[in-house]
Amino acid sequence: MENTADITVLGAGSYGTALAISLASNGHRTLLWGHEPEHIENLKNDKCNQEFLPGIPLPDLLIPESDLATALAASNNVLVVVPSHVFGLVLAQAKPLLRKDARIVWATKGLEPETGRLIQDVAREVLGEAFPLAVLSGPTFAKELAAGMPTAISIAGTDPQFTSDLVELLHSPKRLRVYANDDFIGLQLGGAVKNVIAIGAGLSDGIGFGANARTALITRGLVELTRLGEAIGAQASTFMGMAGLGDLVLTCTDNQSRNRRFGLALGKGSDVEAAQIEIGQVVEGYRNTKEVYTLAKRLGVEMPITEQVYQVLYQGKSPVDAAKELLSREKKSETSAE
């Protein structure tokens, strides 16, 4: 079957729309599917995602589409950009409609709820082994990407040709630099753990701690990410790149980050429900914290920052008490395995 579009993007939120804008601005006919027909109709009429990216026009090569079958028939390249807790559901809806030559890439950051499984495991469970898989990850705020500001990401996958094709599709000399990476596991994990550490950074700043504490938290958060990554077969070097250190620094230090703002609100005294309402969009790190905590416990990996964030979010611990417990931990060598 011939493509009538170069790529189909599933998920018309802020990040899905931003990636679709970048692809279309790069000269690629791009279908953007969303599950709410009214939202898609608004995109068509407004030529803009007024709800999530107001003021940024949609390129002519970006075609909003509310019918999933039509969207999936248009291209064999499918980019999934939905929250991690609905990733499996969206894939299950898509499965009977996928072309036989379909290739699936996702920009979803997180793990499977409750189990802490990697997104690749969810994809394989739903789709089987028939389709090439890939993931893109890195330090990206949707608004900046959509506005054409310089951005860099990494891509890894199960099929070298698919990875190479994605680099060609996404890379733009003017707006988006794309690095190929061979660590499929590491790229998936980085996007989940950084959300947890970003909440921790927000908590720290919300309490009133300064730049010293935030920097220490980011640094030790990177250690936790690397420790967990190595335990599941990732390469430590990956976490010094875009999907590790890059995403971690971005998300922990800039208030465009929902996870950081969520932590700030909690640190200033809001409860979890009020903080989520204040943000007004999905805070991936809330669920990611439980997912990462579950995975770390299952593997016996020590992640003290993650554990304290988990206790604040799910066990009612005060941010101040969590900070005190981190500071009063047993003295250790910086380079120890714990």
UniProtKB/Swiss-Prot annotation:
Binding site residues for sn-glycerol 3-phosphate: 109, 138, 140, 194, 247, 257-259
Reaction(s) this enzyme catalyzes, per UniProt: sn-glycerol 3-phosphate + NAD(+) = dihydroxyacetone phosphate + NADH + H(+); sn-glycerol 3-phosphate + NADP(+) = dihydroxyacetone phosphate + NADPH + H(+)
Active site residues of this protein: 194 (proton acceptor)
Gene Ontology BP, a term: carbohydrate metabolic process
Keyword NAD: yes
One Pfam family cited in the UniProt record for this chain: NAD_Gly3P_dh_C
Residues holding NADPH: 14-15, 35, 109, 142, 258, 282, 284
Ranges annotated as spanning the membrane: none
Compartments it resides in: Cytoplasm
E.C. numbers: 1.1.1.94
GO cellular component assignments: cytosol
Recorded metabolic or biological pathway in which this protein acts: Membrane lipid metabolism; glycerophospholipid metabolism
Keywords carried by this UniProt record: Cytoplasm, Lipid biosynthesis, Lipid metabolism, NAD, NADP, Nucleotide-binding, Oxidoreductase, Phospholipid biosynthesis, Phospholipid metabolism
Paired cysteines (S-S): none
UniProt GO molecular function: glycerol-3-phosphate dehydrogenase [NAD(P)+] activity; NAD binding
Protein role: Catalyzes the reduction of the glycolytic intermediate dihydroxyacetone phosphate (DHAP) to sn-glycerol 3-phosphate (G3P), the key precursor for phospholipid synthesis.
Record-stated family: Belongs to the NAD-dependent glycerol-3-phosphate dehydrogenase family.
Record's protein name: Glycerol-3-phosphate dehydrogenase [NAD(P)+]
Organism from which the protein derives: Shewanella piezotolerans (strain WP3 / JCM 13877)
Organism placement in taxonomy: Bacteria, Pseudomonadati, Pseudomonadota, Gammaproteobacteria, Alteromonadales
Name of the gene this protein is made from: gpsA
